[in-house]
């Protein structure tokens, strides 16, 4: 039950402000400005909902469990409250959740025995292409399998505290490691499949949290995953988080983008 709750709250909007001077995703730091130019803030109406990644001037990827209506996105943002020179606002014309993802988990807020969170990936088609600048850039899809032990970076505007939700204005980054899927299988009763990646720190203290869903997992400089689900409280020892394994979906993403220019 706690895992399902976190899976849902990872994609809920910001409601609280971070205390002054605190700069953590969970155990992270303020990202250097414009160091993550592919990072996207996905909004439901006017409320931040999830993270996302710009993979083409007209396409953003995020988590399928962020599925909603009336999306809009911000590109080139570091601080969500300030006017910034590279910031670009775009509306979304259409969303494409992966057909293999079980949307009933989200719609019914329940999970039947045997269900899992496989295929937690969605494409968002922008009404107007992004302008590529120093602050807004695309990142390539992976071409090779990630290696266990790789140093990874994940980012987002999610909660900086593990239970009492407090949200930063500035984009947060945290360095973690890619772990074997067996680590996550051992940590959770929920099924961890071959279309998922396991990443975090077994000692705890560094993790994604509420609001980070759909954001990037970049390992050794390569986009390899999208934030999907984890435990609550965030950042607990022996409870790494789970990410969608993008290399398993490159053919599907390219097909959708080609058929919907």
From Swiss-Prot:
Glycan attachment points: 108
Family: Belongs to the peptidase S1 family. Kallikrein subfamily.
Prosegment location in residue numbers: 19-24
Presence of the UniProt keyword Membrane in the record: no
Name of the featured protein: Prostatic glandular kallikrein-6
Function as written in the Swiss-Prot or TrEMBL entry: Glandular kallikreins cleave Met-Lys and Arg-Ser bonds in kininogen to release Lys-bradykinin.
Peptidase S1 domain location: 25-258
GO molecular function, one term: serine-type endopeptidase activity
CDD domains: Tryp_SPc
EC number: 3.4.21.35
């Amino acid at each position: 039950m706690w895992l399902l709750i976190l899976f849902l709250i990872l994609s809920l909007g910001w409601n609280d402000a971070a205390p002054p001077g605190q700069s953590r995703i969970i155990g992270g730091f303020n990202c250097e400005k414009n160091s993550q130019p592919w990072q996207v803030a996905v909004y439901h109406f006017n409320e931040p909902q999830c993270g996302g990644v710009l993979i083409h001037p007209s396409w953003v990827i995020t988590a399928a469990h962020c599925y909603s209506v009336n999306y809009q996105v911000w590109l080139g943002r570091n601080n969500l409250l300030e006017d910034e020179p590279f910031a670009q606002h775009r509306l979304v014309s259409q969303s494409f959740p992966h057909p293999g993802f079980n949307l009933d988990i989200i719609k019914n807020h329940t999970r039947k025995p045997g269900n899992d969170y496989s295929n937690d990936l969605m494409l968002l088609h922008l009404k107007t292409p992004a302008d590529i600048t120093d602050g807004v850039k695309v990142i390539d899809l992976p071409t090779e399998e990630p290696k266990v032990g790789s140093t990874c970076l994940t980012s987002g505007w999610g909660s900086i505290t593990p239970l009492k939700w407090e949200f930063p204005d500035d984009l947060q980054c945290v360095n973690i490691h890619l772990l074997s899927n067996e680590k996550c299988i051992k940590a959770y009763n929920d099924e961890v499949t071959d279309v998922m990646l396991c990443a975090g720190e077994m000692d705890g203290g560094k993790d994604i949290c509420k609001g980070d869903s759909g954001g990037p997992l970049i390992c050794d400089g390569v986009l390899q995953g999208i934030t999907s689900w984890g435990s609550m409280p965030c950042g607990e020892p022996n409870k790494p988080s789970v990410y969608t394994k993008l290399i398993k979906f490159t053919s599907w993403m390219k097909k959708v983008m080609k058929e919907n220019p």
